[in-house]
Amino acid sequence: MSRDPLPFFPPLYLGGPEITTENCEREPIHIPGSIQPHGALLTADGHSGEVLQMSLNAATFLGQEPTVLRGQTLAALLPEQWPALQAALPPGCPDALQYRATLDWPAAGHLSLTVHRVGELLILEFEPTEAWDSTGPHALRNAMFALESAPNLRALAEVATQTVRELTGFDRVMLYKFAPDATGEVIAEARREGLHAFLGHRFPASDIPAQARALYTRHLLRLTADTRAAAVPLDPVLNPQTNAPTPLGGAVLRATSPMHMQYLRNMGVGSSLSVSVVVGGQLWGLIACHHQTPYVLPPDLRTTLEYLGRLLSLQVQVKEAADVAAFRQSLREHHARVALAAAHSLSPHDTLSDPALDLLGLMRAGGLILRFEGRWQTLGEVPPAPAVDALLAWLETQPGALVQTDALGQLWPAGADLAPSAAGLLAISVGEGWSECLVWLRPELRLEVAWGGATPDQAKDDLGPRHSFDTYLEEKRGYAEPWHPGEIEEAQDLRDTLTGALGERLSVIRDLNRALTQSNAEWRQYGFVISHHMQEPVRLISQFAELLTRQPRAQDGSPDSPQTERITGFLLRETSRLRSLTQDLHTYTALLSAPPPVRRPTPLGRVVDDVLQDLEPRIADTGASIEVAPELPVIAADAGLLRDLLLHLIGNALTFGGPEPRIAVRTERQGAGWSIAVSDQGAGIAPEYQERIFLLFQRLGSLDEALGNGLGLPLCRKIAELHGGTLTVESAPGEGSTFRCWLPDAGPLPGAADA
């Protein structure tokens, strides 16, 4: 089980420490054990309705002392509301779900009742209420139209702050936007005349600690009615059923952190209210409202503000998406040019560095590093070469396929000195890891930030809330212009485009290189042995021809001795051998550079019949018997090449099958193709030679003892590979051999309909 790296301290009422700026992120603000005094709070068992806890001021609002309330049931206390309350808040419902009612209470007049459930606990809040101005709903309707009509985010922020101030009457209303580092900036402000302006000011993250931001994300409205009012404890302070603090994160009456109360008083604020702006599940910002005097906003108006906050959240999401879409639209044609060039490129370096593509302008960058196939080159203003090497080495340590920052020195401290040309970085990987990548760089911008009284570092110096909120100007170094969200999305899409396009082209190049390497090796082997194997028959023919010229002849010129007859027979055999070798060499060299064959439906039985007819004299001479399966399939193949393959395989079986060879030709369906097996019962082949026989001119035994020319089986394997298939042998000494050629099916084949 994972453990929170910053666990909460126990609350002060359980012996926890005093909260300071150094430990405020660990303050348990959701379990204060007390409430604000402008209302009363009860907790009750979610099943029985038994009252478990009450605020010590309950008698002021409910007319009953805690000792009287404790142990009562909600059915007795709220007989009219209890059934509806149970139905509205069933067990397991979200804690954001509420039950609302207005009570006519003898002790306090009209009370607003708000109830929510936290696990097995019901939390009931009672506040005095009065009729809301009837113009309120109309004002909300008008506000909705105004928000929807705002043309951009800046206008939307201004409309929101002005509308909230008109609805509520707060002295100051700000829209406060969080940055990625959790600092916040006031991007819009509506204020009473005479108040100091905070528009454009930035505030450190410590002003709203992490646990407060998390609470604002879950519960959208927070009210501090009086920054000088004392909190009212719960009685008992712990839930008597669990002996644990009661979670009040969703209660509007929850007591405010003493640290935050002092912070507000130091600002001269008498009351405050905030409404969360949550976009995509993340806390985007706050509508922050300040009043110089205590101010209890009526519950109905608070609900209206919560609706307004939700609408603003949706409009922010819409406006930001529209801004990104408009930005992306301006890049679409540029992206298309890059994609088209990459798709037709065999040299990524040369193509992507072409000034006509303007990859620098695509991302509004000052410099670009292109890294492909172990080398890099640059465009525009970039750091010196050693720094580029170091930057690329650092990138290789980064996870993911996209890295972006507007402050490289913060992400990579060693890169701080590169700020003049590389304060900002946007990098995409277009290969495996970062071996192939594009890295855009932006130069440093000298920025002047207006802080609302203290920089983040200064805010850490005091143990208590700061007192000064005067404007403090800070020059920020090491920052570049932030990358627009549209640029980041564009980089991601460009990565996908280039990864696909370059991946295909690089794969083609690598395949071609491998094929070329293999082909060169085969040609070198061919050149090395061809002279010997071609010269041997020629040498023998020459020698025997010379002997023949020395033999006596009859008057009619015919041989007149057995020796002459033997020489003549030898010449004929060697001439035949030379002819066979020449034909096989011609076929093999043609296949080395041949395109994939055109595969048509080919009846295998017809091809086997043709081969056996060609081999009929040899079959008769050897006394061989050949068994052919009765039904052979139609195979997707080049008929001529398939015939050559079977001619060699069956011919091999005749040569090496022993006396009176017994040969079998069979087929079987294997996966998405057919296996053709040619078997003999000859001497067999030892395992260590079973791959060697498929190499060029490799024959078992010495040259004088071995049969064949050493080209037949390599030729057969090449034919199989050109069809996308394989050729293997199964054999053992003394047990014969089976050569298996597997040929895959093809897609729709030419002439398939007529087969």
Swiss-Prot record:
The keyword Transferase applies. InterPro entries: GAF, GAF-like_dom_sf, HATPase_C_sf, His_kinase_dom, HisK_dim/P_sf, Light-responsive_reg, PAS-like_dom_sf, PAS_2. Coiled coil: none annotated. Residues 26-94 form the PAS domain. PROSITE patterns: HIS_KIN, PHYTOCHROME_2. Residues 152-316 form the GAF domain. Keywords: ATP-binding, Chromophore, Kinase, Nucleotide-binding, Phosphoprotein, Photoreceptor protein, Receptor, Sensory transduction, Transferase. Residues 529-747 form the Histidine kinase domain. Gene3D superfamilies: 3.30.450.270, 3.30.450.40, Histidine kinase-like ATPase, C-terminal domain, PAS domain. Contains one covalently linked tetrapyrrole chromophore. Lacks the cysteine conserved in plant phytochromes (at the position of Met-259) that binds chromophore. An engineered sequence used for X-ray crystallography forms a thioether link to biliverdin through Cys-24. The natural sequence can bind phycocyanobilin and phytochromobilin in vitro, but the identity of the natural chromophore is unknown. Residues 95-504 are annotated as: Chromophore binding domain. One of its GO terms (biological process) is osmosensory signaling via phosphorelay pathway. Its EC number is 2.7.13.3. Changing residue 259 to A: Binds PCB (in vitro), but difference spectrum is altered. It comes from the Bacteria. Pfam families: GAF, HATPase_c, PAS_2, PHY. The keyword Nucleotide-binding applies. GO terms for molecular function: ATP binding; identical protein binding; phosphorelay response regulator activity; phosphorelay sensor kinase activity; photoreceptor activity; protein kinase activator activity. It catalyses: ATP + protein L-histidine = ADP + protein N-phospho-L-histidine. The modification Phosphohistidine is found at residue 532. Photoreceptor which exists in two forms that are reversibly interconvertible by light: the R form that absorbs maximally in the red region of the spectrum and the FR form that absorbs maximally in the far-red region. Also has a slight blue shift for the far-red maximum. Could also absorb green light. May participate in regulating pigment synthesis like the carotenoid deinoxanthin which could protect the bacterium from intense visible light. In the N-terminal section; belongs to the phytochrome family. PANTHER family: BACTERIOPHYTOCHROME, TWO-COMPONENT HISTIDINE KINASE. This is Bacteriophytochrome. The lineage of its organism: Bacteria, Thermotogati, Deinococcota, Deinococci, Deinococcales.
